[in-house]
């Protein structure tokens, strides 16, 4: 597998921020600004039809967690994804057709906008995933569209018609063109695809491969794509063909077998960003045991990940995974097991643990979340240190 260099300004910005912490030759103890991860936020789906979606923030410094329902109003019914831009967390509320704006420091609701009012009833219903690029936000809707949202005016400036039931999205491209890649899940009906949007011209084309039937998340390195696909279900609801696929020029190769969620972190060699480490877990419907894997896009190697040291807070029903973009530490969220039934309880608050990149539980990092933790993100801040 070719070892492609990153060629997007977004990737290089991340590389420069990280390497500035590593390659400091200052010997006079002059205070320097460095970027650190200050915490993690978790979007909790809440209980179906109870309107109790919430946000949990885990503060690294105090190792304490706060879960908020935004003054009682909550994040609606089934918040599904979130993206941090500046000091605002933009949360997509799938059932409510909303994008909620939350202040990342006070965890209070700033504002909200209706995606159906912005885009139309049929185009804007059920927003699913959101990302940011060049100070704009991009979100998918089950109406089959991607909306481009101006965070200052809260208006949709462009909308792009993509495939059926779009989910995750990611930016990639070449030295001359920036593309937005979109997972079209087809709602699990088996005719999934990837849409490629040229951000300069607005043109859209479709990438299809028979192996990729139900794409959910996507990671891009240039035009190399790594797609988390949920495959399909047989008549007994066994999940078949789920995994992580490498897609290039229309081909698709499974690099991780059996995976239901994933997150990534940039790999650095000699201070240069060279690829991703993609960490996955597999816990399909009906499972009793989760498995974890790591795939290195630079070497093309897959390895297993074994969690350890967490016997007091064992992850038994994983629901989300996030990888700290600076340290590579891993946060895994879990549903709580009902002691009477022995099964995951979808009505109780969940919890999360932090692990080193090698899978060792980090003492003091167990914390409670809201009901059904679903999406994990991280907050980065600049701080002044002396060397």
Predicted feature locations:
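Bacterial Sec-dependent N-terminal signal peptides
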Residues: 1-41
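A short beta-strand motif characteristic of beta-propeller blades
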Residues: 22, 63-74, 108-121, 155-160, ...
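Short coil/turn segments that connect the beta-strands within blades of beta-propeller domains
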Residues: 36-40, 86-88, 134-136, 174-178, ...
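Conserved beta-strand positions in repeat-built beta-propeller and related beta-rich domains
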Residues: 42-50, 91-95, 138-143, 180-189, ...
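Blade-loop segments of beta-propeller domains
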Residues: 67-131
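Repeated scaffold domains used in trafficking and secretory/extracellular systems
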Residues: 76-84, 121-132, 164-173, 211-222, ...
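Acidic, serine/threonine- and glycine-rich low-complexity intrinsically disordered segments
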Residues: 155, 164-287
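Intrinsically disordered, low-complexity segments enriched in Gly and acidic/Ser/Thr residues
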Residues: 256-348, 354
């Amino acid at each position: 597998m070719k070892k492609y260099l990153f060629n997007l300004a977004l990737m290089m910005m991340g590389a420069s921020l990280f390497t500035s912490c590593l390659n400091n030759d200052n010997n006079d103890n002059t205070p320097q600004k460095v970027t650190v991860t200050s915490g993690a936020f978790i979007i909790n789906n809440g209980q179906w039809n109870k309107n109790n979606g919430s946000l949990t923030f885990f503060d690294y410094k105090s190792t304490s967690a706060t879960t908020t329902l935004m003054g009682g109003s909550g994040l609606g019914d089934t918040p599904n994804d979130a993206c941090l831009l500046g000091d605002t967390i933009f949360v997509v509320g799938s059932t409510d057709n909303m994008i909620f704006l939350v202040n990342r420091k006070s965890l209070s609701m700033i504002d909200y906008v209706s995606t159906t009012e912005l885009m139309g009833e049929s185009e804007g219903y059920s927003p699913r995933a959101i990302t940011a690029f060049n100070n704009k936000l991009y979100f998918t809707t089950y109406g089959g569209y991607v909306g481009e949202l101006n965070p200052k005016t809260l208006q949709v400036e462009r909308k792009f018609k993509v495939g059926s039931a779009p989910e995750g999205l990611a930016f990639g491209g070449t030295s001359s063109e920036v593309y937005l890649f979109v997972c079209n899940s087809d709602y699990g009906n088996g005719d999934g695809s990837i849409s490629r949007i040229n951000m300069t011209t607005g043109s859209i084309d479709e990438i299809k491969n028979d192996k990729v039937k139900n794409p959910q998340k996507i990671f891009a390195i240039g035009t190399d794509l790594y797609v988390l696909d949920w495959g399909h279900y047989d008549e007994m609801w066994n999940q078949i063909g789920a995994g992580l696929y490498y897609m290039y020029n229309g081909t698709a190769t499974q690099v991780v077998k059996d995976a239901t969620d994933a997150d990534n972190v940039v790999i650095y060699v000699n201070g240069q960003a060279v690829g991703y480490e993609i960490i996955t877990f597999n816990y399909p419907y009906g499972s009793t045991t989760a498995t974890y894997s790591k795939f290195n896009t630079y070497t093309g190697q897959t390895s297993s990940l074994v969690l350890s040291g967490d016997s007091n807070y064992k992850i038994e029903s994983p629901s989300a995974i996030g990888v700290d973009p600076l340290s590579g530490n891993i946060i895994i969220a879990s549903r709580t097991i009902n002691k009477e039934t022995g099964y995951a309880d979808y009505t109780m608050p969940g919890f999360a643990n932090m692990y080193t990149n090698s899978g060792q539980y980090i003492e003091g990092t167990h914390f409670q979340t809201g009901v059904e933790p679903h999406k994990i993100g991280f907050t980065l801040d600049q701080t002044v240190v002396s060397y």
